[in-house]
From Swiss-Prot:
Subunit structure: Homodimer.
Broadest EC class assigned to this enzyme: ligase
Keywords recorded for this protein, A-Z: Aminoacyl-tRNA synthetase, ATP-binding, Cytoplasm, Ligase, Nucleotide-binding, Protein biosynthesis, RNA-binding
Positions of short motif 'KMSKS' region: 222-226
Occurrences of domain S4 RNA-binding (ranges): 345-411
Pfam families, alphabetized: S4, tRNA-synt_1b
Enzyme nomenclature, EC number: 6.1.1.1
Keyword Transport: no
Protein's UniProt keywords contain Aminoacyl-tRNA synthetase: yes
Free-text function comment from the UniProt entry: Catalyzes the attachment of tyrosine to tRNA(Tyr) in a two-step reaction: tyrosine is first activated by ATP to form Tyr-AMP and then transferred to the acceptor end of tRNA(Tyr).
Species this chain originates from: Chlamydia trachomatis serovar A (strain ATCC VR-571B / DSM 19440 / HAR-13)
Name recorded for this polypeptide: Tyrosine--tRNA ligase
Source superkingdom: Bacteria
Localization annotation: Cytoplasm
Lineage, opening ranks: Bacteria, Pseudomonadati, Chlamydiota, Chlamydiia, Chlamydiales
Length: 412
């Protein structure tokens, strides 16, 4: 375990760890949780997936926990307001999709679902066997609880109980699967230490925790959001091209953290890329984008992203071909819409309806600044409508927002 700790420190991705962890000898098992609050994992989850892969490389058996029960509650960590509760059918569907995704990214890994043990736990048993081991004083002292208790929003008993459920998960895995280590982002440290204390109070043995830094920008905001929404790992929600472009657009100062947390490149290569960042940041970002997209979507997904990028950006000053437009739509960089749904509508309304712009206000500003392009020509009039003369090959329209954001409309 000492080798892993040293590597994480050298890489700069060790946030916190339990005393004595470095002396733990392998083989041991470690787990990391994924709550099914959406039908897809997002780019923030990729940090955890890479972390589990890193553990496996050091002889530690990784376990992925899908929170089929805790996903019904919602983790208050890092949240200023309470999550909207999902219904049971949605959580069940999300859980299946998340488990399938984890199995594809982590072949052979043990995947467990806490609904299998928490779902049958009665309220009386929970209060007797779990609740009695926790003291309100220490729970209220946790940062995540303290921040919410004294906020205008407050915290519900439902969210307040999340810490106990996560602690029970750790104890269950410790007892049933000999999982002695729980890992997570830095915002999970309070929950993890509560689980360690719970395991000790029950006399089960010594457990440990290990956390990595959250991936945030210079303002402390989690990386992985854009004006269009979350960056998903499911290619149907975020096509490989969009994932590729997301990393190309990141500020130069953020790419160093990205390559440490979202890739498995060895430390020596990371340090060499750090040096190259000062002289050629765009080349480094392109390389890191290629590494991550290939890791997430495979060689085929990377090829799609590269082909789409070449078609979009090499098309400036030349006509884009029908074959290129078809390939872009098939690679997920397009949207298929019935012709009758859009012909005759204002572009101002269309770009909002398709999610290309977040609001009419944003669309108006882009038009006024000549930053919204239709088939590579700036849209000058916000009252302009889509008519048949604007269709390429009587079917397609190429939308552009500035230099980076592109989309093909397929009026099939």
């Amino acid at each position: 375990m000492q080798q892993l700790i040293d590597n994480l420190k050298k890489r700069g991705i060790l946030d916190n760890s339990s005393a004595g962890l470095e002396s733990l000898t392998v083989p041991v098992s470690a787990y990391l949780g994924f709550d099914p609050t959406a039908p897809s994992l997002h780019i923030g989850h990729w940090i955890g997936i890479c972390f589990l892969r890193r553990l496996a490389a050091y002889g530690i058996t990784p376990v992925a926990l899908v929170g089929g029960a805790t996903g019904m509650i919602g983790d208050p960590s890092g949240k200023s307001v309470e999550r909207s509760l999902l219904d049971q059918a949605q959580v069940l569907d999300n859980s299946k999709k998340i488990a399938a995704a984890l199995a594809s990214y982590l072949p052979g890994i043990r995947i467990v679902n806490n609904a299998d043990w928490l779902g049958s736990l009665s309220m009386v048993d929970f209060l007797r066997d779990v609740g009695k081991h926790f003291r309100l004083g220490s729970m209220l002292a946790k940062d995540v609880v303290k921040q919410r208790v004294y906020s205008e929003e407050g915290i519900s008993y439902t969210e307040f109980s999340y810490l106990l459920l996560q602690s029970y998960d750790f104890a269950h895995l410790f007892k049933e699967h000999n999982v002695v280590l729980q890992c997570g982002g830095s915002d999970q440290w309070g929950n993890i230490t509560s689980g360690i204390d719970y395991i000790r109070r029950r006399g089960l043995g010594q457990a440990y925790g290990l956390t990595y830094p959250l991936l945030t920008d210079s303002k402390g905001k989690k990386i992985g959001k854009t004006e269009s929404g979350t960056i998903w790992l499911d290619p149907a929600l975020t096509p490989p091209y969009e994932l590729f472009q997301y990393f190309l657009r990141l500020p130069d100062q953020e790419i160093s953290k990205v390559m440490r947390t979202l890739t498995l490149l060895d430390n020596e290569e990371i340090f060499a890329l750090d040096e190259r960042l000062t002289s050629d940041p765009q080349a480094v970002k392109k390389y890191i984008a290629e590494v991550i997209v290939k890791d997430v979507h495979g060689s085929e997904g990377l090829a799609q992203a590269q082909a789409a990028t070449e078609s979009f950006f090499a098309s400036k000053g030349k006509s884009i071909t029908e074959a290129e437009l078809v390939a872009l739509v098939e690679s997920g960089v397009g949207v298929k819409v019935a012709r009758t749904d859009l012909i005759g509508k204002r572009w101002l309304d269309i770009v909002v309806e398709l999610g290309f712009c977040s609001s009419r206000g944003q669309a108006r500003r882009l038009i006024q600044q000549r930053g919204l392009y239709i088939n590579q020509e700036p849209l000058a009039d916000e009252q302009s409508i889509l008519d048949g003369t604007q269709l390429c090959f009587d079917r397609y329209v190429l939308l552009s927002q500035g230099k980076r954001k592109k989309q093909v409309i397929d009026l099939n």
